[in-house]
Amino acid sequence: MWKQVEFELQSRRRGFHLITGEILRNLPPLPKVGLLHLFIKHTSAGLSINENADPDVRVDMESIFNHLVKEREPYYQHTLEGDDDMPAHAKSSIIGTSITIPITNGKLNLGTWQGIYLCEFRDYGGNRRVVATISGE
């Protein structure tokens, strides 16, 4: 069995945002066993799985990525879309645009402290589109 849905996430400011609930609300019923693949259709945002309990983790992740990839570097050629755009492309490539999660007994088989993150790398990224592909039985 294969299912695929595409949906829009609400607009968020730059940062790492826990979106597990929003993802689940947009999915059709899940099979008993299978895989959920999520793909974000943008080049300046990403998806990740990380801690869902302490919000300081999300703040720290933002700080780490801003330290790794700085804005306004003199060697950036792609600068027409703002100071945050080229760094957003680099951060998206580092973190990735897709994740895969196992489905067990009709539920996402995430660890106790795991949640799905939208990694928004633009100051004002706008609405983001996600393709969810479900396989299983």
Language model regions located:
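Active-site histidine-anchored catalytic micro-motif
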Residues: 1-137
